[in-house]
Curated annotation (Swiss-Prot):
Any GO MF annotation of the entry: nucleotidyltransferase activity
Paired cysteines (S-S): none
Domain of life: Bacteria
Pathway in which the depicted protein is active: Amino-acid biosynthesis; L-lysine biosynthesis via DAP pathway; LL-2,6-diaminopimelate from (S)-tetrahydrodipicolinate (succinylase route): step 1/3
GO CC aspect terms: cytoplasm
Protein name in UniProt: 2,3,4,5-tetrahydropyridine-2,6-dicarboxylate N-succinyltransferase
Reactions that this protein is recorded to catalyse: (S)-2,3,4,5-tetrahydrodipicolinate + succinyl-CoA + H2O = (S)-2-succinylamino-6-oxoheptanedioate + CoA
SUPFAM superfamilies named in the record: Trimeric LpxA-like enzymes (SSF51161)
PROSITE patterns listed in its UniProt record: HEXAPEP_TRANSFERASES
Residues the entry annotates as binding substrate: R108, D145
CDD domains according to UniProt: LbH_THP_succinylT (cd03350)
HAMAP family tied to this protein: DapD
Length: 276
């Protein structure tokens, strides 16, 4: 994979010269990088020795693919006979699929679920009508509920529940240095938004309507500690407000009200019956 990375890095430096007319090793390298992302053999970010590391070259490969591929008429559905048409550069992950491909994939995708090619969907995932963008990674056992958006290159862990209308931010526009990450066993409440490379630590629970960006203050109500850019593992988080000491308007914040306990887990546990 080192040779592939070298090819992508060189192409990135010469990106102004790359277009839909480009052929040869650059196109081959980008196509291979997207294949690796799609299959899950590679991912834009991974945890190494307990810390998240972003493979910037894979993100660059995703961006280069937009220069290499022209817009074309697209239709969705098995063997291209579904709904549409659309005018886009990135094909649907499921284009040309029939029963054997879905059985090998091992996940469930209901009508209205859209996944772009270059995104990976793990075993036992359920995709309700939702959108998973290119470079995204959804790990095993996760529920992607109705109207969820998983942004470009976002990383979703194992056994996560993304409730209805949740938005997980991408990296492509506006351009972000690192992807948004939801670690294993998290529950993200309905209509919540997590964006701009924020990391939600393992086992955390966000209530309905929590909004966290890279600049949002995440306040621990018990200790007064303020976190920026990361929700500590096993936190229970609700929307809050920081009052202005001078009597002016308060500012939005997220508040850690407690750590996850047995009662919280019972309310947010995944339903194995849905994954049989």
């Amino acid at each position: 994979m080192a040779d592939l990375q070298t090819e992508i890095e060189a192409a990135w430096e010469a990106r102004a010269d790359i277009s839909a007319a480009t052929t040869g090793p650059v196109r081959t390298a980008v196509d291979e990088a997207l294949r690796l992302l799609d299959s899950g053999e590679a991912r834009v970010a991974e945890k190494i020795d307990g810390e998240w590391f972003t493979h910037q070259w894979l993100k660059k490969a995703v961006l280069l693919s937009f220069r290499l591929n022209p817009n074309t008429v697209m239709r969705s559905g098995a063997l291209g006979g579904g709904v549409g048409p659309w005018w886009d550069k990135v094909p649907n992950k499921f284009d040309g699929w029939d029963a054997p491909q879905f059985e090998a994939g091992g996940f469930r995708a209901v009508p209205g679920a859209i996944v772009r090619r270059g995104a990976h969907i793990g075993k036992n995932v359920i995709l309700m009508p939702s959108f998973v963008n290119i470079g995204g990674y959804v790990d095993e056992g996760t529920m992607v509920d109705t109207w969820v958006t998983v942004g470009s290159c976002a990383q979703i862990g194992k056994n996560v529940h993304l409730s209805g209308g949740v938005g997980i931010g991408g990296v492509l526009e506006p351009l972000q240095a690192n992807p948004t990450i939801i670690e294993d066993n998290c529950f993200i409440g309905a209509r919540s938004e997590v964006v701009e490379g924020v990391v939600v630590g393992e086992g955390s629970v966000l209530s309905m309507g929590v909004f966290i960006s890279a600049s949002t203050k995440i306040v621990d109500r018990k200790t007064g500690a303020v976190h920026i850019g990361k929700v500590p593992p096993y936190s229970v988080v609700v929307p809050g407000n920081l009052p202005d000491p001078n009597g002016g308007p308060g500012l939005y914040c997220a508040v850690i009200v407690k750590t996850v306990d047995a009662q919280t887990r019972s309310k947010t546990s995944i339903n194995d019956l849905l994954r049989d």
